[in-house]
C-alpha cells in the first residue's frame, strides 16, 4: 500500500515517487502495489477521478485531475469505483423513512439503542468495531481493525461526535446488527 500521495504536475516527479515505493516494496519481498490507501481500512483510500469542483468529505482525499492522468501513464488501473454523495434534506421525505422504519421494527423485532451521552455511545463501540470487521472482511484489501486501532479511534473520534448523530440497532436477542454515524 502507498498513501499520502502529493506531487506537482510533473510526470517525472510522480514516476520518481512511484519508483521509490516499488523499490521499498521489493526490499520487503512484496510483488504488487496498490494505492493511494492509508495504513488501515479506517484511513482515507482511493484517488479522486471525477467531481473536482466539489469539496471532499472528511474520509476522502482531494486530488487534482493530473494525479489520475499521471498514474494511468505509469500503468495503474482503476480497481474499484466509489461514489461519494450528498443528500439534501429539503428533498427527503421523513414520513416515508418513519413508515419504513416502523415496518422493519415490527417485522424483525429490532430496536434503536438509546445513546443520549458519549458514555452511553462508548458502551457500544466495541460491538460496533466487531460488526465493522465482520461486515467488511469479505472485501478485497480489507485490513481488520486491531484492538490497538480500536482504542485509538475511540479516543480520536467518539469524544467530538454528537451522540445524536450516532445510531445503533440491535436484534431481538440484543446483538448489535447495524450502526450509522
What is each stretch, according to the model?
Residues 1-75:
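Acyl-donor binding region in acyl/amide transferases
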Residues 14, 60, 64, 78, ...:
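Active-site-proximal structural scaffolding
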Residues 155-167:
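A short helix-loop-beta-strand connector motif used in the catalytic cores of GNAT acetyltransferases and
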Residues 25-28, 160, 170-177:
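Secondary-structure transition/capping motifs at alpha-helix termini
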Residues 1, 168, 175-181:
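Conserved beta-strand in the GNAT
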Residues 31-38, 79-86, 168:
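A structural signal for short, well-ordered beta-strand segments and their strand-loop junctions
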Residues 61-141, 178:
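Acyltransferase donor/substrate-recognition loop-hinge adjacent to the catalytic core
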Residues 137-154:
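Conserved GNAT-fold acetyl-CoA-binding loop/helix
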